[in-house]
Amino acid sequence: MVALAVALGVGRFAFTPLLPLMLQSGSIDIRHGGWLASFNYAGYFIGAITCAALRVDHARMVRVALAITAALTVVMGVTDAFWIWALVRFVGGAISAWAFVFASQWGLRRLAELGAHRWSGVIYTGPGVGIVGTGLLVSAAGGLGAKLGWIGFGLISAALAALVWHVFEAAPRRVAPASPAVAAEHSEAVAVGHDRPGSHTRPSGRTAPPARSSASTHHARPDRTIHRADAIWLVVLYGVPGFGYIITATFLPVIARAALPGSPWPDLFWPMFGVALMAGALLAARLPLHWDNRMLLAGAYVLQAAGIASGIVWPTAAGFSIGSMLIGLPFTAITLFAMREARRLHGEHAAGLMGYATAAYGIGQIAGPLVAAPVAAHTGSFSPALWLAAFALMLGAAGLLIVTRVSKRRSHR
């Protein structure tokens, strides 16, 4: 949890509460702020898809990631050169992706060894803890400016890394390659305690060979066709929330300060997002496994769309508070539901599918700030970009409902 709080909560998301201070100091404008955000998300995308090529000890990689995250965070506060910021944010994004994957796998393995599967959800509250911490610290000490904020977060990250350094001891086992998809599958299996019915997997995690009959062979081809179509739509529609949530996740304090000038509330909306994220991480894995994942995804998209709309049509403290929680609550749940759907479609071979889906999500994240920042700079408001994000989420939800209906109709033929 601490590792993810540092790598993601600070390394990836501390930019959000500090961006208003950077804008206020004149060291950056909103357009370049959008570029910095997209550089970070591009780095995360590259880091995520290169994890499979890294054959390193998980614990050692987490240590390296924590140390680099702390150092890069300090660098953000000691220079004003945009090209250095861009490089730091890009590299920091890749490091945070590696930290997420390797820390997840290390933590889940340790919990399995200790027989403490029920605590797996706590690992994924880490980003929320980091978001809450950075948001509250900026709210309390924002007057010190962005530079000291970056340096302070870097020093705090270094202290937290030192605190857990001894925990990440190198494992004597053979190190297997890691990927976000494999980590995702592992986390989903551990979080729920058993596999989905029909996956041909025993609760112990060992694969049981499915019995094949002439009937199953006869229906194999149409089943594969249906699953292939569903898999394609999963990849396409999983990219939607990447675009949908990221505009708010990047610019929420900026948007709130513009709507509520002089109010102390804008600095608190980001921590509210973090609290909701933690709650969602703990609750999502406890939902019944027999519920349709695509319907759950559609519901999560609608929640995030409603959260975005709340801040636009009701630009008050209450509206932004509700919006922050509605966007944060399904943040982790969306990933979990997509993992489960990938496992339903491809069983033990879901890693490739989840990798493609993760790539689509990453592309959405990169595109969000690149669209929002120029629109805001041109119109003087984020509302058009936010409405576009909300519309995209609703369109994605509608697409999931249609795919679900068509898939069920085909399977009953």
Summary of predicted features, one role per range:
Residues 47-59, 142, 280-293, 376:
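Helix-to-loop junctions at the C-terminal end of transmembrane segments
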Residues 46-81:
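Conserved MFS/SLC helix-loop-helix module at the cytosolic interface between two early adjacent transmembrane helices
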Residues 348-381, 389:
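A late C-terminal transmembrane helix in Major Facilitator Superfamily
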Residues 291-338:
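C-terminal transmembrane helical hairpin of 12-TM major facilitator-type secondary transporters
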Residues 122-175:
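Helix-loop-helix hairpin linking two adjacent transmembrane segments in secondary transporters
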Residues 16, 229-271:
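Extracytoplasmic gate region of multi-pass secondary transporters
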Residues 27, 78-84, 292, 313-315:
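Helix-breaking motifs and short loop linkers at transmembrane-helix boundaries and internal kinks
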Residues 88-126:
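Cytoplasmic helix-loop-helix junction between adjacent transmembrane helices
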